């Protein structure tokens, strides 16, 4: 029997007032991606969410953050790896339709340029790595909630 490695991830469905979903394309990533990343030692999924969104998008303020679900996704190629994925939803007030963000932190992604844009949730089928699995859990209208910033 082969040992399986478990990796904990925080995944962010970030939307804006129009209901559009933030996605990006970048080097080393196949297909459309959402902000996501591996939890660091001692970090909670929520803390990782704020860090990853800031690192990969440059956005520093997230509104109405809510946990949607947690699953286990298995990469079947050798060596097998299981990802414990924590999916969150957050809204932002972002007027730009498209922008390029260069990662300043983020370890292996440092210096990578991500091309960010907004898409309708109906385009989620184009997402890589089954990242579209829980788009159906997004509210039909963005919630008006408390504001939480990356520094929280």
PLM ranges: what are they?
Residues 100-140:
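NUDIX/MutT-family hydrolases
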Residues 7-11, 83-87, 113:
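Short hydrophobic/aromatic beta-strand or adjacent loop that forms the aromatic wall/cage
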Residues 127, 142-151:
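Short, charged, intrinsically disordered terminal tails
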Residues 18-21, 29-31, 40-41, 73-74, ...:
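Short, charged/polar surface micro-motifs in flexible loops or helix N-caps
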Residues 34-68:
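The catalytic Nudix box helix
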Residues 73-104, 117, 138:
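Active-site-adjacent beta-strand/loop module that shapes the phosphate/pyrophosphate-binding cleft
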Residues 30, 63, 68-69, 82-86:
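A generic structural signal for short beta-strands and their flanking turns/coil linkers
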Residues 1-34, 46:
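N-terminal strand-loop-strand
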């Amino acid at each position: 029997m082969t040992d399986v490695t478990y990796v904990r991830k925080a995944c962010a469905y970030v939307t804006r007032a129009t209901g559009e979903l933030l996605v990006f394309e970048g080097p080393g990533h196949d297909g459309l991606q959402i902000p996501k990343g591996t939890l660091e030692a001692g970090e909670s999924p929520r803390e990782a969410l704020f860090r990853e969104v800031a690192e990969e998008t440059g956005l520093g303020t997230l509104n109405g953050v809510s946990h949607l679900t947690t699953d286990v996704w298995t990469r079947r190629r050798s060596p097998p790896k299981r990802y414990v994925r924590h999916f969150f939803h957050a809204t932002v007030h972002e007027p730009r339709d498209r922008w390029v963000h260069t990662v300043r932190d983020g370890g292996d992604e440092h210096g990578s340029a991500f091309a960010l844009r907004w898409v309708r949730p109906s385009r989620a089928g184009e997402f890589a790595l089954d990242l579209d699995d829980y788009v159906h859990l997004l509210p039909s209208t963005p919630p008006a909630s408390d504001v939480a910033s990356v520094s929280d």
